[in-house]
């Protein structure tokens, strides 16, 4: 039997959506939370585990410490804004449960594994980058020296094992919606631009683009684009519809949903019979989504991320006229242009801004 494992998106300051839940850790104008999808994958692989999303479910630090007292392994997804409070929580958990092993995961510890281990003696392991199988192997008792992608202490020194390669077979991973159904209350999740209640998940990992504003590819999933099969995605969506018949929108929170045009069209065709309302995060190149080829009449909202200047891939990609011309009457999109970054040139920002008006 593996160690009894608690996967934790830790409690934080009021209305802060960070750590495991958010691509953009933030306190927003209205209280809103994303799903802790990264923690759901390994949670689905370990018998007896639990995924605790403290911020969205209103679980206090004191309650979290008591819950952690019943587990042998704690996997905490930290963030840069929340790291200081997460250190305090880790020490409190260790005081309550001296035998528990504590693992920190997420972009912050991936970028600064040695510093994080030195700053917090309560941390036993840091799992860098994609941590799904690293966490599972630790829970199953594999020797730390044999686990790829981790940093840890040994004889007073901090050791850094070789990186774990990006996961290629995404179909082998559990369906996160099974873990959501088991451990989470979907009524606790709301995002202003999505219909309520919503459910979010991934169909791909990684992104070859080098956009400076995007967290996951830069510090967690990397730039190697990997995809689930369209059959696997459609199967999970059919099951999710049975789990939650009242869900108003399913959101594919991929770094870039529409990188491969043929796959996008194929997946849209398999989703159409399910009669779902769904949306996705996309590069600002959506002809396959908005044209009749995809037949995705239930594609509700398309966040189109555009960064002017330095990392603009094609100038035409931020021209919205083509979307207006190609989209069907039941399709909606929104753009999120990014401005005032250190990489931007004034002229490029002005030109890009004009094309979005």
Give the ranges of each region predicted by the language model:
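Cofactor-binding loop segments of dinucleotide-utilizing enzymes, especially the Rossmann-like FAD-
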Residues: 8-10, 54, 79, 107, ...
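Electron-transfer interface patches adjacent to heme c in soluble/periplasmic c-type cytochromes
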Residues: 288-357
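Radical SAM [4Fe-4S] cluster-binding motif and immediate context
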Residues: 176-287, 291-294
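Conserved acidic residues
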Residues: 72, 124, 212, 248, ...
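Short glycine-rich His-centered loop
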Residues: 2-32
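N-terminal [4Fe-4S]-dependent radical SAM core
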Residues: 2-3, 144-147, 153-200
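Protein kinase-like catalytic domain
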Residues: 139, 215, 241, 300-303
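Glycine-rich beta-alpha loop elements in corrinoid/cobalamin-binding modules
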Residues: 38, 42-169
């Amino acid at each position: 039997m593996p160690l009894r494992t608690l996967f934790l998106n830790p409690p934080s300051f009021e209305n802060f959506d960070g750590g495991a839940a958010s691509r953009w850790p933030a306190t927003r104008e209205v209280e809103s939370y994303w799903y802790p999808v990264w923690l759901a994958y390994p949670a689905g692989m370990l018998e007896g585990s639990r995924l605790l999303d403290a911020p969205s479910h209103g679980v206090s630090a004191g309650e979290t410490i008591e819950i952690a007292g019943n587990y042998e392994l704690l996997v905490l997804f930290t963030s840069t804004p929340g790291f200081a409070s997460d250190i305090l929580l880790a020490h409190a958990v260790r005081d309550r449960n001296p035998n528990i092993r504590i693992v920190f995961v997420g972009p912050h510890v991936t970028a600064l594994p040695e510093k994080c281990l030195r700053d917090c003696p309560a941390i036993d392991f840091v799992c860098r980058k994609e941590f799904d199988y690293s966490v599972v192997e630790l829970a199953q008792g594999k020797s730390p020296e044999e686990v790829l992608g981790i940093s840890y202490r040994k004889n007073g020194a901090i050791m850094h094992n070789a990186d774990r390669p990006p996961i290629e077979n995404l179909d082998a991973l559990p369906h996160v919606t099974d873990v959501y159904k088991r451990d989470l209350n979907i009524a606790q999740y709301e995002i202003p631009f999505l219909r309520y209640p919503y459910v979010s998940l991934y169909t791909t990992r990684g992104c070859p683009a080098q956009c400076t504003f995007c967290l996951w590819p830069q510090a967690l999933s990397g730039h190697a684009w990997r995809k689930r099969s369209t059959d696997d995605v459609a199967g999970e969506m059919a099951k999710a519809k049975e789990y939650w018949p009242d869900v108003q929108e399913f959101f594919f929170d991929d770094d870039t949903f529409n990188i491969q045009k043929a796959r996008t069209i194929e997946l849209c065709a398999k989703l159409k019979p399910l009669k779902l309302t769904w949306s996705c995060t996309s590069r600002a190149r959506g002809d396959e989504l908005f044209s009749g080829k995809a037949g995705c009449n239930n594609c509700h909202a398309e966040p189109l991320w555009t960064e002017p200047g330095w990392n603009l891939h094609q100038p035409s990609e931020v021209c919205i006229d083509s979307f207006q011309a190609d989209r069907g009457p039941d399709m909606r999109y929104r753009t999120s242009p990014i401005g005032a970054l250190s990489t931007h040139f004034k002229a490029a920002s002005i030109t890009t801004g004009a094309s979005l008006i």
